[in-house]
Structure formats: structure tokens, C-alpha cells
């Protein structure tokens, strides 16, 4: 089964995708995690994405689509997947069609603006492995330190206070 989860940043797409992924035994494909992994491993697309990510800008559709094509071609996606954060634009949606990807269900998560602000302003991400935390709802065991790899947790560059407000 191929699913898409839509919603504003902080709506809970990643949280819900994780639950569904475990229940259906299909991978959660997060655009953000894919991009961070491509940057970390220094792939061709990762090198291209790094400059945009470092400045807090959105990565171009061509780069995101290229990374997604590579990801859904992997063996663990043969029985389905959950797209979390993709598509974000008409060209990205058209790319799914052009790839011949059949989407079985699209779920959109609606959350009030005030809740979104509260969720996003408390989010933290590990500099090392990309694990996500929230200072109120899902804190790390030691404040500012990733439970998984021990690296520092930070506010994502695309979620600084100005972009939240």
C-alpha cells in the first residue's frame, strides 16, 4: 500500500507515519530525513541540497524528486511506503505520476495554528543522526543530547523563531 500524509509542519505527519509504518510493515519515507541522509553521505543530490538546507531555504523540486526516485526503488519499498512531506508542489506530484507510482490513500492532518506554533517551537533535531525530539512532548533523556547517538540536539535551521511566528 502506498500512502501520502499531508499537513502543515508540526501537524504530526511524522508521528502518525511512524505508527502506520509499524502497523503495516512498510517504510516511512520522510523528505527531510531523505535530504539529511543524502547530505550526510555526500551523494550527488546531497551536495546540491546542502547549500539550500544550510540557508534554511527549500531544496529544489529536481533534487527532491531525484532523491525520492532513488529511495522508492529500494527493496524495502516493494510492498509499499508512506510518503511524509512529499509532494509539496505540483511538479513533485506530477513527478509521482510520471514515475508511474500508484497512490492508494492520501491522508491530510489538520491542526489549529496555535497548536502548530507550540509544536514547532519546541522541536529539536539531532545534528548527528537526525532523530527528532520535542522539549515538552518527546524530550531526550538528557537535555540537548541525542538518546540514539549522543550528538547535540538543535533547533532546525528551517524552524528558527522567525519562521515559526
What are these regions (language model features)?
Residues 1-165:
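Glycine-rich phosphate-binding loop of ATP-dependent small-molecule kinases
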Amino acid at each position: 500500500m502506498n500512502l501520502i500524509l499531508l499537513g502543515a509542519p508540526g501537524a504530526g505527519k511524522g508521528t502518525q507515519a511512524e505508527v502506520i509504518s509499524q502497523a503495516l510493515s512498510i517504510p516511512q519515507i520522510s523528505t527531510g530525513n531523505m535530504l539529511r541522509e543524502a547530505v550526510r553521505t555526500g551523494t550527488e543530490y546531497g551536495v546540491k541540497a546542502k547549500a539550500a538546507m544550510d540557508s534554511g531555504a527549500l531544496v529544489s523540486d529536481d533534487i527532491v524528486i531525484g532523491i525520492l526516485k532513488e529511495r522508492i526503488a529500494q527493496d524495502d519499498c516493494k510492498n509499499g511506503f508512506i510518503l511524509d512531506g512529499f509532494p509539496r508542489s505540483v511538479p513533485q506530484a506530477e513527478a509521482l505520476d510520471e514515475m508511474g507510482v500508484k497512490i492508494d490513500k492520501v491522508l491530510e492532518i489538520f491542526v489549529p495554528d496555535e497548536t502548530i506554533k507550540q509544536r514547532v517551537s519546541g522541536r529539536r533535531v539531532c545534528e548527528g543522526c537526525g532523530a527528532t525530539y520535542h522539549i515538552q512532548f518527546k524530550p531526550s533523556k538528557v537535555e540537548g543530547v541525542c538518546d540514539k547517538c549522543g550528538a547535540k540536539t538543535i533547533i532546525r535551521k528551517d524552524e528558527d523563531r522567525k519562521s515559526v511566528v
